[in-house]
Every structure is written in C-alpha cells, then in structure tokens.
Amino acid sequence: MGRAARRAAERAGAGEYVYDCVRRDPRWDPRCESRGLYYARLMVDLELPAGPVAEHLFDPSDHTDQGDWRVELALDVLSRLVRLSRREAAPILRRYAEEGAHWFDALDTLVELGDPSLTIGLDELAAARCDDRALGMLIPAGYNPVIETWAARQPRIAEALARRREAGRARRPAGAAADRGERTEAELLDLARRQGDGAIGAIFELGRRRTLALLDLAEELLPARPSRFGGAVCRALREYGPETLPRARVWAAQRGGCEDMGLRILARYGTRQDIPFLMDELRGAVGRSEWHDAASPIEGLGRLRAGEAVPLLKTAWTESTYAYLRPRILTALTRTAPHTAESYTVEGLWDCEEGVRLEAVRSAPLTEDTRIRLQRLHLDTAEEPGIRAAAATRGL
C-alpha cells in the first residue's frame, strides 16, 4: 500500500485509480481495515477534487442498494478530507445526511468530526428522524461539542444525552462480584456450564483466578457453534501465560475446534520448539491465500525471531490483500531480519494501516526522504496521536 501511494504521486492518471478504489471499496475485511485516511491523503497529494466522490454517493443506486458498504468508505474519505483542511468535503457530507439513503451514517460522521459549525440546523433532522435508540447510538461516550450544541436546542437530544451520562455512571452491584469471589471453583464451573444468568461472570472469575479448569471448559464450549460464552472463555484465556502451552499444543495439532485459540497461545507464549509447527501453519495459509489463518503464525514467528520465516513473510506482504496482517508482517520482519526490513519500513511510512505506520516510524532508516515524511506525519493533525508523537521523537 505504501509503495502504491508513492508511485501514484509520479504517475499521470493515478487519480482515477483512487476514485475507483473509493467507489468499489477493495478492503478484504472492512471491519478491521482502515483506508479512509490513506485515500484522503492521496487525494490531497494529487490535488483531486471531491466531486467524483459526491457523484458516487448520489448515484441513483444509492436508494436501491440496501447495504451501507457502498457508501461507508466514501463517507470516511470525506471525513478525513475535512480533517486534512479540505473543507469542501463538509457540504457533501451535510447534503448526504439530508438526502442520502444512509443518512444516519453521514450524520454520525459529522458528529465524530466534532465541529458545530459544520452541523448547524442538523439537530432538527436528528430529532425528527431518530428514535430513542438511534439517538443513543449517535451520542459518543465522551464530551462532544456537536451533541452539546444540539442538546441545548433539542429536548429529545438533551434527554438522550442525560441517559447516556446516567448509564456511564451506573455500576454493576458489588454484591454480584463479591458473591462470585466467594464461590468455589466447582461452583463457578457449574454456573458457567449452565450458560444462564451469571455464566459470563463466572467465566471471568475463573479467568481472574487463572485456574486450569477453564481449559476444560474451553474444550466443551469452543467446538460448538459460536456463542457469547465461548467468546468470554477466549477473552478470559488471554490473561493466562505459558502454563497453557501444553494444552495449546494439543489444541493446535488436533483440529478439534480449539485450534484457533491454541494457535493464539502459541503465538504469544510458544518457544523455539514450536517454530516448525508455526512454519507449517504459515506455509499452508500462504499457499491457500487464507490470510485470516496467517495472523497467529506470523505473530509467533516474529516474536521468536525465526529467520527461516523471512521468505514467507515477504510473500505475505506482497500478495496479501488483508491489511490487518500488514502490521504483524512488518513487526515480524523487523525482528527477524532488520536489514531486509529497511525497505519495507520505508514503504510503511505511507501505508494505510495505523499499526504499519507506527512500526515504520519507529524503525525506518533516517534519510532525507524519510525525515521529510516523519515531519509530515508529526505535523498532520489527521494522523493518530501515537504516530505523531513517535514521528516527533524520531525527527529530533
């Protein structure tokens, strides 16, 4: 992604490729891949107008296509353009909030921008169109100047804001937690197995105690269809350490329904004896282009500084369309082959993924070009605070 961004600045007609990406949203997994700032920066660098993005939003298909995937990336790009001082993007967001099929998404985007001057009059639209549930979804957890301004004008929004604040102050009764703390391990396991009221709390209490009995519970719940109870077990097991390795090795090898959790544990706590297994897993994932399956092996091999993984890491970096992998690949490369990783870290300074940019800022060799890029990242108010701070430190 970083290489493409650098090439775009030198290639005539690259703008149409940028617009095409915004229109069709090429993200492999939109839930965990970020491209809005990446495309917005390209539009700024290439001096591309926002008009074609607006044309995409207001295409007649907007009112016939029920899925919000068609406009999600375009709205994010416009929001990022506003943050990059391209204010002409704001009226497009306003107009889509007023006229678009997915008006709530645009309204939510404008609220997130936190600038009351961009949302004058939209409080009436929000109060008229949103039921109580939608208003609750519109209100962020923290202070937001747009919502505060709207609440001063609209009683329903003020009531929704009051409900959100009250919910934030509410705490779970201490008695329930104290009761779980007094139960025996066997009682907690029985409560968790019943999967009724209190089961989630019992699972987390078992996790807090780091009892190995939770591994037995995992073998019962994880092979079944996905559920919130199995998810709670996975979250609780994240607090465990190397004591889970013997079971994790069995899970990863047996494919009995717990293999994903087993691989995560091996990635986090495995030793050098696990390198051959992790290599086999990565080789298979790359060969099948099953990029979801590559995440844990990459993380583990990078942590173990397994030099034999470098060719596969380079292949994954080049071939994978799954941006979620990119921070893990770059981190693994910098740990296993620092010299080889230098060109990848330079490329990463222009990447779409926050984690890649952060690793690149920390590791890229200092040259005239990279110093200029670090300075730009430091001064970019649309950039994530952690990246700006790291860029400032490297640039000193």
What kind of region is each of these model predictions?
Residues M1-A199, T211, E383-I387, A392-L396:
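Extended amphipathic alpha-helical repeat scaffolds
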Residues G36, V71-A74, W103, G196-I200, ...:
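Residue-level detector of extended alpha-helical repeat arrays and alpha-solenoid scaffolds
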